[in-house]
């Protein structure tokens, strides 16, 4: 294996979430979010504290603020969760709340985007073949937009079926392809000649990493793969998948959190 798995949490943050590769994240966001031209962004604290100590805090995969003060949350999820859409909405509430001062009569806030990169299909999009779907708050009958301050974007990579021979230079489709196939590649395909792909391949190449980073990447990918295999085995053996998946995902998130803090 020459390149690291972009859908691994640790690797995704390595390729998209560092100051040295910020241009990759900016290009990705400009491709995913329609009618935007993000020039710069700032990576922010990924942990959001709940106002109620009895309620859950939130830890994002990626959180950034753009040059126009928009807040963007990016989540990468490999295993299906029955309440994933609710989780996405829950994440958005932290970014709305944190922009409004307690006791203020002014409830204005900057736009919030939650981008979900998924290795599964959500039930809410069943029957829709589109890889990217975008949701806003709209009126039921007229579909009039209530506000453009909340945007939920889902990228269901299972719906992307194109091979390298089908790519035509579209940057977003090229990113979909890389997210699904990076570990299978021996070199950067010629069709992926945009500067953003050169950076993505350079950062994700294992031999380009320092020894500590490479060790962390390999350990993280191996642990994630082993846990997925355990869950698949449990399913085959007739063990309740939900219980096994919950335990395994909890272990993955815990390991990712520890490694991200190293």
Which residues are covered by each model-predicted region?
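Accessory alpha/beta interaction modules
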Residues: 1-153, 159-163
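Short runs of predominantly hydrophobic/aromatic residues within well-ordered alpha helices
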Residues: 8, 25, 111, 151, ...
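Short amphipathic C-terminal alpha-helix that caps PH/PH-like domains
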Residues: 29, 92, 171-179, 204
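Short secondary-structure boundary micro-motifs
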Residues: 36, 45-49, 137-138, 172-174, ...
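Short, charged alpha-helical interaction segments and adjacent helix-coil junctions
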Residues: 72-77, 177-262
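Short intrinsically disordered coil segments
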Residues: 129-136, 168-175, 219-221
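Upstream accessory/linker segments immediately N-terminal to the RecA-like ATPase cores of bacterial MutS
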Residues: 148-193
């Amino acid at each position: 294996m020459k390149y690291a798995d972009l859908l691994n949490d640790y690797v995704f943050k390595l390729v998209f979430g560092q100051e040295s590769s910020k241009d990759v994240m900016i290009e990705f966001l400009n491709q995913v979010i329609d009618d935007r031209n993000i020039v710069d962004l700032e990576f922010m604290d990924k942990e959001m504290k709940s106002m109620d100590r009895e309620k859950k805090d939130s830890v994002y995969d990626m959180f950034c603020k753009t040059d126009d003060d928009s807040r963007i949350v990016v989540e990468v999820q490999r295993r299906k969760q029955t309440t994933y859409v609710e989780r996405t909405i829950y994440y958005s509430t932290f970014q709305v709340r944190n922009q409004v001062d307690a006791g203020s009569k002014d409830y204005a806030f900057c736009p919030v985007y939650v981008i979900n990169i998924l290795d599964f299909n959500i039930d809410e999009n069943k029957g829709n073949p589109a890889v990217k779907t975008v949701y806003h708050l709209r009126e039921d009958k007229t579909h009039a937009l209530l506000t453009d301050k909340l945007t939920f974007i889902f990228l269901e990579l299972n719906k992307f079926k194109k091979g390298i021979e089908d790519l035509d230079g579209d940057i977003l489709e090229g990113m979909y392809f890389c997210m699904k196939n990076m570990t299978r590649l021996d070199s950067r395909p010629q069709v992926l000649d945009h500067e953003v792909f050169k950076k993505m391949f350079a950062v994700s190449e294992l031999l380009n990493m320092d020894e500590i980073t490479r060790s962390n990447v390999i350990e993280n990918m191996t642990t994630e793969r082993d846990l997925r295999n355990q869950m698949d085995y449990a399913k085959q053996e007739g063990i309740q998948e939900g219980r096994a998946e919950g335990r395994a995902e909890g272990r993955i998130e815990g390991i990712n959190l520890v490694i991200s803090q190293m």
